[in-house]
Regions:
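Alpha-helical scaffold elements lining the catalytic groove of polysaccharide deacetylases
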Residues: 77, 85-88
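Catalytic nucleophile-His microenvironment captured as a short glycine-rich beta-strand/loop
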Residues: 19, 91-126
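Noncatalytic regulatory segments and standalone regulatory/sensor domains
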Residues: 113-156
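Mid-length scaffold segments of soluble, non-membrane domains
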Residues: 36, 43-74
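Extracytoplasmic/secreted cell-surface and envelope-processing proteins
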Residues: 52-59, 101-106, 129-132
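Extracytoplasmic/secreted envelope proteins and their assembly/folding machinery
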Residues: 20-28, 38-42, 58-65, 79, ...
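Active-site-adjacent structural segments surrounding the nucleophilic cysteine of cysteine proteases
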Residues: 1-50
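Loop/turn elements at helix/coil->beta-strand transitions in domains of secreted/extracellular proteins
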Residues: 68-72, 88-92, 115-118, 145-148
Length: 156
């Protein structure tokens, strides 16, 4: 997200407001085998899926998936469905409210689950001090505790 920090998005920039498209770019790159940047993830739609003062509309994820050929997207609030999907190799985006991952609202990628049931996270706003890329998270106490919703992406 910060690599594309000064690129305009919404009322600000990708750095300040682009966690949704940046999360989608990670998943689309994985599913298509082609590098899709956060710039690519917003260039096709501009700000049409952005609500000022709120952020990226949830409907963006299915629309972007359709646009980039990433397959079906299932929206859920069920953490067990998410764990099952992760164990089957399906990447997931989670909308987070204030808590471990953010002080406001934020989208993160759940990229997998360990043999011990811990969730692996790609955070578009990760840093060397947080180092979330190298951590394992408990689904119920750390991820689901502040989750608003999840989007499970079909693996093509």
């Amino acid at each position: 997200q910060t690599d594309y920090g000064n690129i305009p998005y919404g009322g600000g920039s990708i750095a300040s407001s682009g966690c949704g498209p940046t999360s989608f770019a990670m998943i689309a790159s994985y599913l298509t085998g082609t590098t899709i940047t956060p710039i690519d993830a917003i260039s096709w739609c501009g700000n049409s899926y952005y609500k000022p003062g709120v952020g990226t509309y949830w409907s963006y994820f299915q629309a972007a998936s359709d646009h980039f050929g990433c397959g079906a997207v299932t929206q859920t609030r069920d953490p067990n469905q998410v764990l099952q999907a992760l164990s089957e190799g399906h990447p997931v985006i989670s909308s987070q409210r204030a808590g471990l991952f953010t002080s406001g609202g934020h989208f993160i990628v759940l990229r997998g689950v360990t043999a011990g049931g811990k969730v692996l996270v790609n955070d578009p706003n990760d840093s060397s001090s947080k180092n979330y890329i190298n951590r394992e998270f408990d689904m119920m106490t750390e991820v689901h505790a502040t989750a608003n919703a999840y989007w499970i992406f079909a693996k093509k």
